[in-house]
From Swiss-Prot:
Binds 1 Mg(2+) ion per subunit. May bind a second metal ion at a regulatory site, or after substrate binding. This is Ribonuclease H. The gene is rnhA. Its EC number is 3.1.26.4. The lineage of its organism: Bacteria, Pseudomonadati, Pseudomonadota, Alphaproteobacteria, Rhodobacterales. InterPro entries: RNase_H, RNaseH-like_sf, RNaseH_domain, RNaseH_sf, RNaseHI.
Amino acid sequence: MPDLVAYTDGACSGNPGPGGWGALMRAKDGDTILKERELKGGEADTTNNRMELLAAISALEALDRPSTLTIITDSAYVKNGITGWMHGWKRNGWKTSTRKPVKNVDLWQRLDEAQSRHTVTWEWIKGHAGHEGNEKADELARAGMAPFKTGKRGKDG
């Protein structure tokens, strides 16, 4: 069975501001890439953290059957949230340890639901450090943001 890996990244021009997300999905056998799929999208008014979350959500939601995969992100927010903080948030009714509402709760709940169908290993890597998969995810995120940046809209937007 091939290994499934998703590199995810978010980008934002201003925070908040126009943003994009990207995910590079790869099925691999050792070092051989068997299949690759690129996903991207964006929003006109968002934050970097929301785009990071949407990248991971989109990767998971793109899978049409329960899968085992590794999600590689340069977002400590996503990695720490999904592997550590979320358990407490859920126990506290989606409130932080200081009893404040969890920011981006809509996306955290969506990520929780999307992850529940799969067996996921989460890995954090340093962003903009020359890691090929992460650099491609960053490129996709910036491409997803491009239509929402001022002066970059097409004639239909």
